[in-house]
Amino acid sequence: MPITPATATPSSSNGTAEAILLELVDENGVTIGTAEKLSAHQPPGRLHRAFSVFLFDERGRLLIQQRALGKYHSPGVWSNTCCGHPYPGEAPFAAAARRTFEELGVSPSLLAEAGTVRYNHPDPASGLVEQEYNHLFVGLVQAELRPDPEEVAGTAFVSPAELTERHAQDTFSAWFMTVLDAARPAVRELTGTSAGW
């Protein structure tokens, strides 16, 4: 799998679309290079930087999304509000805000860091591996959603009880419970104990 220094600039000499590069990191989250997105997710996977966003409405309900059916990785499954990968050199906070707007057509009214979590989750359905150093963010959303259908097949605001029910019947991303559990202390601080998270 190709690895380049994190400061390298991708180039395309044949006029085709440039490869999407991800930041490879060590176990402490320190950038050690880049790799093409698909190759970083092929078994056994390469540890790379990612982010996960959890946005809540004024009633303390979590916004979840169903990933578009056209995605090559985990299509059609439900997951957290937004997740993705910063561009090499891009701050995870900036990437989280950018991708939330690109996918859902809305900017959070509040977005705060909620820690990091490291995991390795094979996805049997796609044969790919999520080996990520994931930056977590929690926040509030108040504007009307305008999801991009190329990215998002559906959205729902759910209470903890509704999420438990959905999780029992619908397919969720391999990483969903790991990132939600890691973000729970910040979620509780944001939503208050009465919300039940």
UniProtKB/Swiss-Prot annotation:
Record key words, sorted: Cytoplasm, Isomerase, Isoprene biosynthesis, Magnesium, Manganese, Metal-binding
Catalytic activity annotation: isopentenyl diphosphate = dimethylallyl diphosphate
Residues the record lists as binding Mg(2+): C83, E103
GO function term, MF aspect, one: metal ion binding
Localization in the cell: Cytoplasm
Protein name: Isopentenyl-diphosphate Delta-isomerase
Cofactor binding, note field: Binds 1 Mg(2+) ion per subunit. The magnesium ion binds only when substrate is bound. Binds 1 Mn(2+) ion per subunit.
UniProt source species: Streptomyces coelicolor (strain ATCC BAA-471 / A3(2) / M145)
PROSITE patterns the record matches: NUDIX (PS51462)
Lineage: Bacteria, Bacillati, Actinomycetota, Actinomycetes, Kitasatosporales
Annotated EC: 5.3.3.2
GO annotation, biological process: dimethylallyl diphosphate biosynthetic process; isopentenyl diphosphate biosynthetic process
Residues in Nudix hydrolase domain copies: 46-183
Superkingdom of source: Bacteria
Keyword hit for Lyase: no
Function comment: Catalyzes the 1,3-allylic rearrangement of the homoallylic substrate isopentenyl (IPP) to its highly electrophilic allylic isomer, dimethylallyl diphosphate (DMAPP).
An example Gene Ontology CC term for this record: cytoplasm
Enzyme category, top tier: isomerase
Family: Belongs to the IPP isomerase type 1 family.
SUPFAM superfamilies for the chain: Nudix
Annotated HAMAP family: Idi
Positions contributing to Mn(2+) binding: H41, H48, H85, E130, E132
Alphabetized InterPro entries for the sequence: Idi_bact (IPR056375), IsopentenylPP_isomerase_typ1 (IPR011876), NUDIX_hydrolase-like_dom_sf (IPR015797), NUDIX_hydrolase_dom (IPR000086)
Coiled-coil blocks: none
Pathway(s) it belongs to: Isoprenoid biosynthesis; dimethylallyl diphosphate biosynthesis; dimethylallyl diphosphate from isopentenyl diphosphate: step 1/1
Active site per UniProt: C83, E132
Gene3D superfamilies: Nucleoside Triphosphate Pyrophosphohydrolase
Gene from which this protein is expressed: idi
